[in-house]
């Protein structure tokens, strides 16, 4: 009941923010006083971005409101986690530099009172979705990981929402992977992390990034877990509707606004199935039949065939139409519980917490 009341209060806060933003922006649209306009700022990291809301550009105004709400929503997520698990898990927001110098936000989770001088095995957890971020779906997994003796970093790679308009831009398989690898290096350098016991865990697009990460830096991770990951981005683009295909092509600079038939090499580069020979880390692959987002026969099924043909060290489990399909890990089902057990058994084998 306490959590429900807290969540209800948070929802009221978001609604209030939306109404406040709407009224404020409406007032600004009528103002001619430049000083009045400049007082309205949207926080983007450490920068105050001033936007002239006297403009007739409705899209700009909507974008400002949308990004502001995403930021408020993300604050609520962190508050909810601390309210529910703060008696045993410490959440710390961090920022680290990616390979190109861009500061990337993230979260570090540790025991509330870490043992002095102890080096903990560590997990990089990688969310999926095309503008998703840390949210309630990860609460149970993070709590379990910390309770079982791991520390966790959760990078909010570029494309994640809740961190401003600039951070919202996606680069599929490029900046997301670079940001996750940078998180792993940052985490490995913390004094309570054992860099020799580092794992990576991802779902959906996060599974794709997990695979790309262990292919790009094969010696960095001691274990990896891919759950319903996108193994072939060329195949993904083949079965998506035209609006989605065009959206992906335009959003990522690496694709240059072109579809696979016009820029095939770029899409093949970000398809993990084409680089399996580089994998060194033991890999656990979990998937389900009946997945509409990452169909088994196009992604996981083919990935397992290639892993086997290349003689890679891996374990796998394919469920038969797990409830929820692509998002079966979000539900409390026998399949989800089995997947969690397999995941921690696998991590325990290679990281020995």
Question: For the regions a protein language model found, what residue spans apply to each?
Answer:
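N-terminal targeting or regulatory segments adjacent to alpha/beta-hydrolase or S9 domains
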Residues: 20-84
């Amino acid at each position: 009941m306490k959590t429900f009341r807290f969540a209800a209060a948070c929802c009221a806060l978001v609604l209030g923010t939306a109404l406040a933003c709407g009224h404020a922006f409406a007032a600004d649209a009528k103002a001619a006083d430049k000083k009045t306009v400049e007082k309205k700022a949207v926080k983007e990291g450490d920068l105050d971005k001033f936007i002239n809301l006297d403009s007739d550009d409705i899209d700009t105004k909507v974008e400002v409101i949308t990004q502001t709400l995403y930021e408020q929503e993300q604050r609520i997520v962190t508050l909810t986690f601390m309210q529910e698990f703060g008696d045993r898990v410490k959440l710390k927001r961090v920022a680290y530099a990616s390979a190109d110098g861009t500061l990337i936000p993230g979260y570090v989770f540790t025991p509330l009172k870490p043992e002095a001088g102890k080096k903990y095995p560590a997990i990089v957890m990688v969310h999926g979705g095309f503008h998703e971020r840390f949210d309630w779906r990860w609460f149970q997994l993070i709590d379990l990981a910390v309770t079982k003796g791991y520390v966790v970093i959760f990078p909010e790679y570029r494309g994640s929402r809740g961190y401003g308009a600039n951070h919202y831009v996606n680069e599929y398989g490029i900046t997301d992977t670079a940001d996750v690898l940078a998180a792993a290096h940052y985490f490995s350098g913390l004094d309570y992390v054992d860099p020799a016991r580092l794992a990576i865990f991802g779902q959906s697009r996060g599974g794709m990034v997990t695979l790309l990460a262990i292919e790009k830096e094969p010696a960095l991770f001691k274990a990896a877990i891919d759950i319903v990951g996108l193994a072939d981005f060329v195949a993904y683009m083949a079965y998506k509707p035209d609006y989605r295909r065009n959206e992906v092509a335009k959003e990522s600079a690496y694709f240059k606004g072109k579809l696979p038939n016009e820029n095939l090499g770029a899409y093949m580069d970000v398809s993990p199935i084409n680089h399996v020979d580089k994998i060194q880390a033991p890999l656990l692959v979990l998937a389900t039949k009946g997945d509409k987002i990452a169909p088994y026969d196009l992604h996981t099924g083919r990935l397992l065939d290639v892993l086997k043909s290349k003689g890679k060290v891996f374990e796998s489990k394919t469920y038969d139409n797990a409830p929820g399909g692509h998002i079966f890990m979000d539900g409390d089902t026998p399949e989800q519980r089995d997947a969690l057990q397999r995941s921690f058994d696998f991590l325990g084998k290679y990281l020995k917490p």
